[in-house]
């Protein structure tokens, strides 16, 4: 299981028949489940069937299954095959963007930024892209923009999602809209104070007593260079509330990043050393420690 929630449908022998991710609503889940039950062949049998007689339907089905298994390159290949096999059928524009953005954001960087931007534009212009997918597109492009270090990349998608979720049409997506409004205030309007206000409003009830949610808020502040003194204070509270191990290490890392951003490099080193003790098998913290130690040495 690599995503939550992950659904794996198997036969009586325990052989995988289908796999999918996510639970947006009961109707969508039921549609996927019904589709899966209508073809009880195993995934291996589906692959053999496609190899023998390629169809757009099977290409798209295997693409979804591969995407749910985090085989984004395989999924991308099959979505493109589906489009080639049936040029008059669905364009799979959003699904293709989804795979390309995942490849770009992955540790191995298996996709160029230019390719992601091109597929995002195609998805935004496609008539088949749903309102929900338009929201996901804006959210994904915000993450892509952060990695690329260029906030302008997300602006047209965030603006479009804000407009699309106005009024009754956006009511089912009101929680997602709150987050989009934060990005809109920060990157489209350039108003950090308004963005911070909206970010607080977007946090769920009880967030001040949750290590994970305190960490998420503090990390948002760090990423956007907003409200750093309070962010550090809240992240330290998160450390106190966090469970020992990986969770505590993650929050310690957030405090370390904020301290480093505020110029307290020595404290960042000590915090990262604590994170390593909490999660010694995670190589990421060793890299963080080396970075912070280098900062300390350069300031001497």
Sequence positions of predicted segments:
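Non-catalytic, surface beta->alpha helical segment in thiol-disulfide oxidoreductase systems
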Residues: 2-42
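Charged, amphipathic alpha-helical linkers/stalks
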Residues: 31-79
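Register position in tetratricopeptide repeats
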Residues: 35, 68, 188, 223-224, ...
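TPR-adjacent "capping" and linker segments in tetratricopeptide-repeat scaffold/adaptor proteins
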Residues: 40-58, 128, 167-175, 205-209, ...
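Alpha-helical repeat scaffolds
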Residues: 43-47, 73-85, 109-127, 150-166, ...
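Residues that mark the junctions of alpha-helical repeat units in TPR/alpha-solenoid scaffolds
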Residues: 54-55, 89-96, 130-137, 173-175, ...
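Alpha-helical adaptor scaffolds
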Residues: 98, 102-105, 138-152, 175-192, ...
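Terminal, low-structured helical/coil segments at or just beyond the last alpha-helical repeat
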Residues: 249, 254, 261-300
